[in-house]
Amino acid sequence: MIPGANGYRLPTLCEAEYAMRGGDPNAPDWDYLFSGAVSEPGKERYSINKGLDPVGWYQYNNKTGVSGTSDSDRENNTYYSYQGTHEVGLKKPNRLGLYDMSGNVSEFCYGKIDWTFTSKIQYTGELEINPVRIDETGNGRPSYGGSWRAGAGGAIVHSFPDNIDSSFSASIGFRVVRSGD
């Protein structure tokens, strides 16, 4: 980030997670698995998770808006579809009024990452507010939110997979934020 800049930019990982969690660490939805929605009990790490249905489009509800129940639904294309993005506002917003923070399109964050570099970062024990890790030799850009092409795991509020920022995909986009004074 450029100190003192107050224009539009990509959010940092911390800003994205804060927005996904709804902005209030004391609210119950801060600990929800998805942005504004709880997980289906016992399905926290499953690709199919009906808990995501109220707030997000993903691989297993992209056709009808409701998750299938098994891989057989995937095989007969009952619910599973590579249909593409959906109009914003068809699912519920989170506490901040933001739509599609989990699902629909995965969104880039600020920074460049080489995951081998990132794994070498040593935690110093110092409190950092909104840290930004940049490795200019990296070709990965962190993203958040999951997409219509991915299972429910990609839509988890603390999941930040990397994407190659020079690649083109209908399932990756961006959302801008504006820096304060």
Q: Each predicted region: which residue ranges?
A:
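C-terminal catalytic subdomain
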Residues: 155-159, 170
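Functional-site microenvironments in short loops/helix caps that host divalent-cation chemistry
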Residues: 1-156
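Short proline/glycine-enriched turn/loop segments at secondary-structure junctions
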Residues: 130-135, 161-168
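Short, structured beta-strand segments at or near domain termini in extracellular proteins/domains
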Residues: 168-181
